């Protein structure tokens, strides 16, 4: 009679929980739902990104004057390199805990593993938190800051630091000089701060809260809103927030200029014979699930107008009120 060996059982477990893991990554990593996603077949992929807009000119009817010559212009594309780097986490659990549980703890571990990877991806794209050195593009915050596209929250109706609505419009205007602002990104509590914005008569500015496009959390001033929450590793085995409220209250971005790369070899692996973090799983009657995903990121900035080189960003940041 054929039997099921250890390898077969591990494969079945990995297959059973891969979908749970993938769903959790997609749900938690807001950047995957917000920006275009490119499925990578290799570790490194070069993408052509528009870097120069051509200019047209009026042409006269003269057969001899320069104004009668149709002008030439060029549209150029720059290579942006996507380099897939690995995010991984291993979650061990005691076999007795699994045996005594009334819930599917392996499924819960898969959800937790996916969420931790999703948050780490968000933090790297937003603020460059532990961003791989092979990702040549600046994080969204760094791009806006280096381009000088920064707006501090101003005052409203005599209340210091209350004009977040006006600051969002100023930031969107900065992006709109060259790009098409489409999304407002912020920390989770920003949705309530925006809902509490009042005009001079005490009436809510955003009533009703407008419905955004699928994948967004609503709409403010024509911008689809996406809110981020949760914590990531701070580099010292502690916690750091995904959204750094000390440096940014919100970010305005042209989503079409951001690309998230995803390698298709996202995996779940069942472990019962390994040594993890100094713990011998077999000796301790423990098992573990190892979760791995490979992601890349690129930002299409510095679009030139005509023949003039330029430094600009499709991102603007709203910083906290600095005080009087």
PLM features: residue spans?
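Short helix/loop capping segments that flank catalytic or ligand/cofactor-binding pockets
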Residues: 55-59, 101-102, 193-196, 261-262, ...
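Structured loops at beta-to-helix junctions and adjacent beta-edge loops in soluble globular domains
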Residues: 48-51, 94, 187-189, 292-294, ...
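Protruding loop/beta-arch "assembly-hinge" segments enriched in small, turn-prone residues
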Residues: 1-19, 25-30, 37, 61, ...
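Short loop/turn segments at secondary-structure transitions that flank enzyme active sites
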Residues: 53-56, 88, 97, 119, ...
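Assembly/oligomerization interface modules of large self-assembling protein complexes
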Residues: 2-89
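Extended oligomerization regions of viral-like shell subunits
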Residues: 41, 142, 146-287, 293
């Amino acid at each position: 009679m054929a039997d099921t060996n250890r390898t077969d059982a591990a494969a079945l477990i990995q297959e059973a929980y891969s979908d749970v893991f993938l769903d959790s990554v997609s749900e938690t990593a807001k950047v995957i739902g917000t920006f275009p996603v490119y499925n990578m077949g290799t570790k490194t992929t070069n993408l052509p990104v528009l870097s120069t807009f051509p200019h047209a000119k009026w042409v006269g009817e003269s057969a001899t004057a320069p104004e009668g010559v149709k002008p030439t212009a060029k549209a150029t594309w720059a290579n942006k390199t996507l380099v897939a780097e690995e995010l991984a986490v291993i979650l061990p659990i005691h076999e007795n805990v699994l045996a005594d549980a009334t819930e599917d703890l392996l499924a819960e571990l898969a959800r937790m593993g996916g969420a931790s990877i999703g948050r780490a991806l968000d933090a790297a794209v937003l603020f460059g938190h532990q961003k791989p050195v092979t990702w040549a593009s600046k994080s969204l915050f760094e791009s806006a800051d280096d381009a000088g596209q920064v707006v501090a929250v101003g005052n409203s109706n005599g209340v210091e630091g209350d004009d977040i609505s006006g600051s969002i419009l100023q930031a969107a205007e900065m992006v709109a000089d060259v790009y098409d602002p489409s999304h407002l990104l912020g920390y989770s509590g920003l949705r309530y701060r925006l809902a509490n914005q009042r005009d001079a008569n005490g009436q809510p500015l955003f009533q009703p809260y407008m419905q955004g496009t699928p994948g967004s959390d609503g709409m403010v001033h024509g911008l689809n809103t996406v809110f981020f929450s949760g914590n990531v590793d701070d580099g010292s085995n502690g916690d750091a927030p995904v959204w750094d409220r000390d440096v940014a209250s919100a970010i305005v971005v042209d989503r079409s200029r951001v690309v998230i790369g995803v390698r298709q070899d996202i995996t779940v692996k069942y472990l019962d014979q390994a040594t993890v973090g100094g713990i011998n799983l077999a000796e301790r009657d423990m098992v573990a699930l190892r979760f791995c995903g490979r992601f890349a990121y690129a930002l299409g900035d510095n679009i030139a107008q005509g023949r003039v080189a330029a430094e600009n960003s499709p991102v603007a940041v709203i910083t906290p009120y600095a005080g009087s």
